[in-house]
Every structure is written in structure tokens, then in C-alpha cells.
Amino acid sequence: MTDDPAKPVGPDADRLPPWLARQLQNLLEQRGHALLLAGPSGLGQDDLALALARAWLCERPTAAGACGQCTSCHAVDVRTHADLLVLLPEQLALELDWPLDERTRDKIEKKEIKASKWIRVEAARPVVAFGPPTRSRGATQVVMVYPAERLTIDSAITRL
């Protein structure tokens, strides 16, 4: 615990560097339907985006973010939350231990395709079907595209 009332307190605030914990709190206070987190590489936009997704999907959120204890928080942590769709280039997904769809994983393992540095159109297509009728747990669904500049033109058009 801290004596500083300006410092956010909570599981996500403890996971993030102080400058990102403050941004998380600001973003939670001004929730919109879409956000673009941009900045130089290495500042933690991906960590901030995931903490924000956790807070939005949390069953018992606090003012500082996700509770870190509920089933939903656990599902985000182990990368299995049905209401979180993360679009990553295959190469980055493998590096960060994010699951790939079974078909793509099999093709990469059989060396039929190389893991891409780009977000392919095949990966973006599920976003079209990912919507209110497919909600699993609550009223919120989150699509996280990281890094957005790795969308191919075709996958960006599919996403729209």
C-alpha cells in the first residue's frame, strides 16, 4: 500500500510502471468504444492495452483496474478469455506465447508456411464474427491489435 493518494493501487497498477499505471487510471475514467495507443517502441503500450482489456473484462473491477482474482482476470492472464480477441503477427504471437488458431499453428509446424511478421487477412477475419451475439461472460468484448502497423492492407480492410 502507498501513502500517496495520486498513485493508483491494484493488481494492474502493481504490474505496470508508474507512468503506465496513471495512464490506465485515466483511460478507465474516460472509456470509449475504441482506443489507439501509440508511441515509440518499448514504452509498454502492449502492457497498458492488456491491463485495460483485463479491467474492462473483469467481473469485479476496482477504480485502479482489474481485481486480479476473478475467473475473467485469470482467463485473460492465461490467454483463454473468450471475449478477448488479440490480433498479432504469427511471429510475435509465438515469441509472446499467445495461442494461434489450430490451422495456422499446424501449417507453421509442418513448415507449409513461415510465421509471418504481418497480421494476415486470415487472422483478421474472425473479428467480423466477433461481436455481441458471441459474448461469453459479460457485456464487454475487446479486440486488441498489436502492433496495428503490422496489419496488411487486406487485413485492415477486413477489420473495418
Protein language model features and the residues they cover:
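Surface-exposed alpha-helical interface segments used for non-catalytic interactions
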Residues: 157-158
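Clamp-loader machinery-focused feature within the broader ASCE/P-loop NTPase space
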Residues: 2-154
